[in-house]
Structure formats: structure tokens, C-alpha cells
Design a protein with these regions (language model features):
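Conserved beta-strand/loop scaffold segments within soluble protein domains that form the structured core
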Residues: 1-111, 115-118, 132, 139-157
Length: 157
């Protein structure tokens, strides 16, 4: 439907030998539509994730705006994240962008927090919370945010 808008959010935290495959599709088949996708994950131990995202703009989907991003925080050297964003654009008047990032905890940031009397464990917890914060802000329900936060703390432990 012309003028439709969608926001997709995903949060994941893998550990052990978990393997998670995520496939997302933002299909623009009408004019003046907007899609906004943000998936964030943290990985521990020997876990692995694969995210494949696709924004499709059909020929009649003019003046659309599509965005997708996948960001991964590696908490162990043995964890692995593959991130494969994609665009299939058949229209000629669109704004479509994608982003992907895979990074590790910043040891200087952890050192700074520890120099202020914060234990390494709490410093890691704070850094992971900060990583997920932009996504958590997208969740309108306090109870859901609280439950997700509790699970994140459990997984970090």
C-alpha cells in the first residue's frame, strides 16, 4: 500500500555452540514506503550467527526509503558472525542503504571503567548494555525491555 511504513528490530545473544541463521526481507512493492531494520547480536564461546538481509524495490516502488543494519559484538575469539546485507533495486527513484559491523569489546573502554573502581565483569555488562541500548529504546514496553535486559545479564554471566 502506498505510504506504508515498517520498523523491524531484532536482538540476539548466542553462546555455547549455538548456531543462529537469520533471513530478513524488506519488500517494497508500492510507492512512498519506508522500512527500517536494525538487528543487533552478541556472541560468546563457539557460537555462530549468519544474517542475510535483503531490501527489494519493485519497478513501481518509486520514492521509497529502505534501511537495514546488522551489528554484532564478539565477546570471545572463537565466536563467529557472518553478515550479508543486500539490495535488489528495480525502481529508479529510491533511497536504500545497508550497513553491517562486527566488532569486539573495546579494552581501553573496559580499562577506563575499571580505573573508576568498576569490576571487569560489571564493565563488560555495561558495555554490552550500551551496545544494545539503541535497539532497546525502540521497544515501547518497559516490561519487555526489563525481561530482555535480565536475559542479557544472564548470558553475560
Amino acid at each position: 500500500q502506498p505510504g506504508a511504513w515498517g520498523r523491524m528490530s531484532g536482538i540476539f545473544f548466542t553462546n555455547g555452540r549455538q548456531h543462529l541463521d537469520l533471513d530478513t526481507l524488506q519488500n517494497h512493492n508500492a510507492a512512498e514506503t519506508v522500512s527500517d531494520l536494525l538487528y543487533k547480536g552478541a556472541l560468546k564461546d563457539h557460537s555462530r550467527t549468519v544474517w542475510q538481509g535483503m531490501i527489494k524495490a519493485l519497478p513501481d516502488a518509486q520514492r521509497i526509503n529502505g534501511f537495514q543494519a546488522n551489528r554484532n559484538l564478539m565477546l570471545d575469539r572463537n565466536a563467529r558472525a557472518d553478515s550479508i546485507p543486500g539490495l535488489e533495486i528495480e525502481a529508479d527513484d529510491v533511497i536504500c542503504t545497508h550497513a553491517s559491523a562486527i566488532g569486539r569489546l573495546d579494552e581501553e573502554e573496559l580499562f577506563y571503567l575499571m580505573s573508576r573502581g568498576i569490576s571487569r565483569e560489571i564493565a563488560i555488562e555495561m558495555s554490552v548494555q550500551g551496545f544494545f541500548d539503541p535497539l532497546m529504546r525502540r521497544i515501547p514496553f518497559e516490561g519487555v525491555r526489563k525481561r530482555i535486559f535480565e536475559r542479557i545479564v544472564e548470558k553475560i554471566g
